[in-house]
Amino acid sequence: MIDEALFDAEEKMEKAVAVARDDLSTIRTGRANPGMFSRIVIDYYGAATPITQLASINVPEARLVVIKPYEASQVGAIETAIRNSDLGVNPTNDGTLIRVAVPQLTEERRRELVKQAKSKGEDAKVSVRNIRRKAMEELHRIRKDGEAGEDEVGRAEKDLDKTTHQYITQIDELVKHKEGELLEV
């Protein structure tokens, strides 16, 4: 019962870190990155579909992304979706390809994006702490119901705290890495 609660909590914490990693990857740095388009969706035959499923995305140069839609009829829709996104880029369309030049970030925009990264990291840490709190409640319930002894639950609580600290540290490292990427000129 205790092992199950700890395993469940660790699994959820792992997912929270994965979500944080995905969220941070969508924040644009000064370099071209295919991941920056993962959240952009277009209406494809009535279904909201991510651009990543409708086109191949390549990065031939550090500041250039080339998007080649699988269907030529989708070029205009993809271009419009990118232009209307919050990426701050201006795509050009040559009929079959979309080229996106990634402009240099201004110092002010870099600071803004660092704040955004820290905010996403903080959200992830709150999520991990909530998972810990729920697992602690489960451990207290196990103790109260007499399913496990005081010592076992105490050890499990220490393990849970250690695991929580480990995942919070991972999130801090992700944010620190992203901050370094953003502030690098």
From Swiss-Prot:
Enumerate the Gene Ontology biological process terms: translational termination
Q: Where in the cell is it found?
A: Cytoplasm
Report the domain of life of the source organism: Bacteria
A UniProt-annotated Pfam family:
RRF
Where does the signal peptide begin and end?
A: none
Question: Which keywords does UniProt give here?
Answer: Cytoplasm, Protein biosynthesis
- What is an example of a GO molecular function annotated in this UniProt entry? ribosomal large subunit binding
- Provide the primary localization: cytoplasm
Q: Does the keyword Cell inner membrane apply?
A: no
Q: Which GO terms describe its cellular component?
A: cytoplasm
Family, according to the entry, reads as follows:
Belongs to the RRF family.
Q: HAMAP family, from UniProt?
A: RRF
Task performed by this protein: Responsible for the release of ribosomes from messenger RNA at the termination of protein biosynthesis. May increase the efficiency of translation by recycling ribosomes from one round of translation to another.
Question: Which protein is depicted?
Answer: Ribosome-recycling factor
Natural source organism: Mycolicibacterium paratuberculosis (strain ATCC BAA-968 / K-10) (Mycobacterium paratuberculosis)
